[in-house]
Design a protein with these regions (language model features):
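N-terminal leader/targeting and pre-domain segments
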Residues: 1-26, 107-124
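Local sequence-structure signature of Cys/Sec-based thiol-disulfide redox active-site neighborhoods
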Residues: 16-50
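Hydrophobic beta-strand anchors of alpha/beta hydrolase catalytic cores
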Residues: 26-28, 58, 85
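Non-catalytic, surface beta->alpha helical segment in thiol-disulfide oxidoreductase systems
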Residues: 80-81, 86-124
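Residue-level detector of flexible, active-site-proximal loop/helix-junction positions
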Residues: 13, 34, 63-65, 92, ...
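Eukaryotic short linear interaction motifs
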Residues: 36-37, 66-69, 94, 107-110
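Thiol-based oxidoreductase modules, predominantly thioredoxin-like and allied folds used
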Residues: 6-11, 30, 42-49, 53-70
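Mid-chain, well-packed structural core segment of small domains
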Residues: 68-81
Length: 124
């Protein structure tokens, strides 16, 4: 059975509400259809998303379709381009991520997901 991956967040208020209601770990990948680096890591990220624990909720957000959250986070220097993945532990009342990844380095991508799997295995 494949893991549900959510592809939309309407606005920053919805994003902040998700963080407040988080019961485990939330991952938000920001991408764009025109972004070549995003395409370079796409398959790897999908594979890692599938391998995350049940208490990890994954979002795969196209910044051209759902730009409000991306612009909000960029204005606060939480992301500075795509591809970027932000990880949040429960509960989080701010927009500051607990973990982040940016770029195309596949070794660092694996390290990022290893950390996510490690913390999601603990009693959050």
């Amino acid at each position: 059975m494949s893991k549900d991956i959510y592809i939309e967040i309407k606005d920053r208020n919805t994003f902040l509400q998700y963080l407040k209601e988080n019961t485990g770990v939330m991952l938000f990948k920001f991408k764009a259809s025109w972004c070549k680096p995003c395409k370079m890591i796409h398959d790897d990220v999908d594979k890692y998303f599938e391998m995350t624990n049940d208490n990890v909720t994954c979002f795969d957000i196209d910044i051209d379709e759902y730009s409000d959250v991306y612009k909000f986070l960029k204005s606060r220097k939480m992301v500075n381009g795509v591809p970027s993945i932000l990880g949040y532990l429960k509960p989080n009342d701010t927009f500051v991520p607990d973990f982040s990844f940016s770029g195309t380095d596949k070794r660092q991508l694996k390290v990022f997901f290893d950390k996510i799997n490690l913390v999601s295995n603990t009693n959050l």
